[in-house]
Amino acid sequence: MEMKTKIREKFKTLFGAEGEVFASAGRINLIGEHTDYNGGYVFPGAIDCGIMAEVKLNGTQKVKAFSIDYDEYVEFGLNEEDKPKQQWASYIFGVCRETVKRGGKVEGFDTVFAGDVPLGAGLSSSAALESTFAYAINYLFDNKIDKFDLAKIGQSTEHNYCGVKCGIMDQFASIFGKKGSLIRLNCKTLEYKYFPFDPKGYKLVLVDSCVKHELASSAYNKRRESCENAAKAIRKNHLEVEFLSDAKRVWLDEVRDEIPAEDFLRAEYVIGEVQRVLDVCDALERGDYDIVGEMMYQTHFGLSKLYEVSCEELDFLNKLARKCEVTGSRVMGGGFGGCTINLVKDELYDAFIAAVKEQFPAKFGHDPKFYDVVISDGARKVE
């Protein structure tokens, strides 16, 4: 049964009425990894899986919510002290509170929602949930909050109600996503531009290694520190360098002897990655997917050898992609596990999947997962 039908039926059973249906999307990031907190570019797009919710105002000061995926019903008020215990419900509660903080009106509503974003694959299911409700509440109460602020409502929900200090990329992609386009977002200025991404004759497939190595958060903080150290050293000679992404490669060479070797490698990766995003955008405008793919491989090399956030499983998948003549492949997300994102020609797709299915479990003792994704629209009302 399709998701919308399932939601409609459950809503009718629980609330005896019909509401309006809203949806938002998970996201991929084609290139531009670990650049967000360095003030650089990211290059995400919304994908064809996400969250869908039916919502109807109920004339009270209570939200009554049912999650189909968790098979759980929760009621909560709209004041700060009413925060629900359930993690999934605190996302909806946070969106309500953050809307109020921005001068928006929020009153009670009934809702049933479900999702088809694979959890734990780094596709931002939480951002899809926040964006669905930020969009729905804005629409139903006619709050006229602009799209930028809807994305920030999602981000602030993570910060203030879910204990996650995330950047803006996931929510931005989820709200601004457009079918057949990727979004180049400048994380320092929040300027953005759409680029066509509709590769005829190619598939975009994620291979989930199904591993998550534990050191992720401490290692992540250490890398942020390295980047800040490098930026600080460069800033002494070049005052215009606010973030590492503002630096030129030759400026980094000038301070090579002043910073630890590790900091130099981290900075070398980031400065290179900022340029690669721009090169990929140029290539897409020319329709040159070979260059796009080559840049993806270069990013993987940088993440593995310079930034050192890959792992044996992801490096194995990347090498296997090269062997199978996959156009582009790289680790996607924070690293230390998770997915590779692969741009594969249609005629090579079956052979690539078969090779991974055979060779990955033989080496690592468990099966990977595969997700084909298509670049799609972000937050919207579903007719």
Model feature map: region roles:
Residues 1-22, 28-41, 75-79, 85-198, ...:
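Gly/Ser-rich oxyanion-binding loop with an adjacent helix/lid
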Residues 2-27, 52-85, 181-328, 343-383:
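C-terminal nucleotide
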Residues 39-46, 223-224:
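Short Gly/aromatic-enriched secondary-structure transition segments
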